[in-house]
Amino acid sequence: MKKIKKLFCICIMLTFVASCAKPTISFTNDEIELINKYSQQKMRVLIYNNENDSLILRQQTKEFSNTDLQSDIFENLKIQMLLTVQDTSNAGVGIAAPQVGISRRLIAVQRFDKVDEPFEFYANAYIVYYSDEKRIGSEGCLSIPNLRGNVERSETIVVKYIDTETLKPLTDTVSGFTSVIFQHEVDHLDGILYIDKLHPDV
């Protein structure tokens, strides 16, 4: 009986210690090394016709945990993605984490539908609604330099994501050109490039 009580107490203690342990981030060592390598500088953009780069660009990305979103590594990634997409030598209107070698569900989108047209980050982003109303427009991509093509997109979408500050799940309804940016960037998170969707009639 004493042995059973002792074992029970040990189990309780182990459970308590485990519950108090600090959660660990899910970033891989390779991801951490790549993010730290650039140390708050712009990152190298992966190119679609580079064989090694293409392997990453075509991957299905992984979600972040809440612990990831609260980490310094995540903050550094955001800073460096922003520096990359705003690089005056090759500026863009959106960027996805896979484009800088990080296969995670994170995008930055320039919100042309908001005052001052800010760049905003969306973690674990998914599009949960596509309108039947479509639009055809010319698109380019930082990962596909010196090329453009016409793509059909929904006029309005609803994007679901995690707010990187509050960690709350949110949705946002977006229309017009900004919705096109969202669709383009979320495609990156699923290993899809705009050249996969070129409109045949234009």
List the predicted regions and their residue ranges.
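Hydrophobic h-region of N-terminal signal peptides that target proteins for export
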Residues: 13-19
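Enrichment for repetitive, rod-forming helical segments
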Residues: 10-13, 112
